[in-house]
Amino acid sequence: MPVTSELILAALLLVGVLAKSHLIAAAACILLFIKLARFDLAFNFLEQKGLELGLLILLLTIMVPLANGKISERDIIYNLTSIPGLLAILGGALATHLNSQGLQMMQADPAIIFGLIIGSIFGILFLGGMPVGPLMAAGIAALFMEFFKYTK
């Protein structure tokens, strides 16, 4: 019996449910529904705009405290001048660099996403992690790959 995309999505749905990763389970379920409904236009849209849409929703969520006034001018100044704030700026800059490396790796080898999903599930189960983004996971994997290239 050949391994089909439907079977892989069903397996990811099951693993997501068993691992109590509602995001992975929901994503697999939605993609399985789209596949079974033969709504291929949705795949095109998700491939072209899904990442941007997801990042937009994430940024909106993160920026709500700015919009509703929970972060004051004093908080902003502190975070631009304090050690924790400067480290946060550095962390943000490094994270975006890693994310771009991860995106390049996923574009060059789309099959790598399966390993990232499995790694995310292990992180949830054994490290108490949160599957926030395959981009960061791919970025870290790309960093590891670069490290191994230099150590050979």
From Swiss-Prot:
**Is this entry keyworded Membrane?**
yes
- UniProt-listed Pfam families: DUF441
- Source organism, top-level taxon: Bacteria
Look up and give the membrane topology term.
Multi-pass membrane protein
User: What are the alphabetically sorted keywords of the record?
Assistant: Cell membrane, Membrane, Transmembrane, Transmembrane helix
Q: Which GO terms describe its cellular component?
A: plasma membrane
Please tell me whether the keyword Acetylation is annotated for this protein: no
Tell me where in or outside the cell this protein is found.
Cell membrane
Q: What is its main location?
A: membrane
Transmembrane region(s) = 14-34, 51-71, 76-96, 112-132
InterPro entries annotated for this entry? UPF0756_TM
Query: Family per UniProt?
Result: Belongs to the UPF0756 family.
Entries under PANTHER family matching the protein: UPF0756 MEMBRANE PROTEIN YEAL
Q: What is this protein called?
A: UPF0756 membrane protein Daud_1310
Q: Which organism is it from?
A: Desulforudis audaxviator (strain MP104C)
